[in-house]
Amino acid sequence: MTRFLVFMIVAATALPAAEYKLKVTPETLAWGYYWAGAKPVLTVQSGDVVEIQTVSGNPDNLERAGLPPEQIQPELRKIYAEVPKESRGPGGHLLTGPIAIEGARPGDVLEVRIRAIRLDVPYAYNSMGRAGFLADVFAQGRTKIIPLDRERNIGHFGGGIDIPLKPFFGSMGIAPPEAAGKVNSAPPGIHAGNLDNKELVAGTTLFIPVHAAGALFEVGDGHAGMGNGEVDITAMETSLTGVFQFVVHHDMHLSWPRAETPTHYITMGLDPDLTQAARICALETIDFLVNEMKLSREDAYALTSVAIDLDITQLVDGTKGVHAMIPKSLFAGMKK
């Protein structure tokens, strides 16, 4: 039994949970930044559950792409009409938050349990910007509307192509260290943020090292689905509502975000250089196997080579991402 899972079981049985709902409004929006100096829009206790609404898109761009005006959420129009440009950050993501978790402090770990994700609108969109992985080949911008069949859980790409929907939040993060200031929401980092990791669907858990008092969690960049790499710079972008439970661990320490699914443990590496991101991820994987599974470093290195996939998370956020998928089934025969 690993430390991750032990923590989750203990926390679930020991912590009474209050439940909250946080709607997205101009007052509860963090536009394009993560920041240790941000004022919390909600403060909760460790163990509490929050339903959080998010929005995505630019109303004018969506209408120009052919989306019927009546499908654009009033909340999205209100945000664009009322959030002053001077209060917007250097990035473009519409993030709901920040939420402070009482008692979280630098050196702790924030566990974010993603309990549920709901598709809020009947469409997604893909915007082919001028900053994608192949921007030198595809220099012209384009936005494509992708109708969503939420009953059948598919997106109609067009031409008879249907895409299974696997909604997740591209950006889930907390404040970076105070010295970093107001950081752009686009590059992910030690604070998590714009990880764009498609494995983080409902039923999974994200672990983030805490760098500021209260942690200051923000979430947005909803995706109905995505391919690893996110090569044209966007996924199937859409508005989502998520249900999250927050648990603070004072006696757990991480250097980089990690995650857990029902079937895998996930380690991550982030760096502007893809090779360096892969190196960080491989070292994180070895550290996990040594510290949690009690393997020797040599065996951990070998197991990473023979049984664990290192996948490209995304190539387009400035800071590139690589994540390792560590199957739990590998350890089924280990003595507890």
Report each predicted region and the residues it spans.
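Sec-dependent N-terminal signal peptides
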Residues: 4-14
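Intrinsically disordered, low-complexity linker/loop segments enriched in Gly/Pro
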Residues: 90-94, 100, 115-201
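Short, Lys/Arg- and Gly-enriched loop/turn segments at beta-strand edges
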Residues: 57-69, 117-127, 214-224, 314-316
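Extended, compositionally biased flexible segments
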Residues: 57-58, 62-102, 114
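Short, basic/aromatic beta-hairpin or loop at an interaction surface
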Residues: 18-30, 70-90, 172-186
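Alpha/propeptide regions of enzymes that mature by internal proteolysis
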Residues: 20-29, 35-51, 56, 87, ...
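Long, compositionally biased
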Residues: 318-336
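Conserved mixed alpha/beta catalytic, RNA-binding, or beta-rich assembly cores of soluble enzyme
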Residues: 165-275, 286
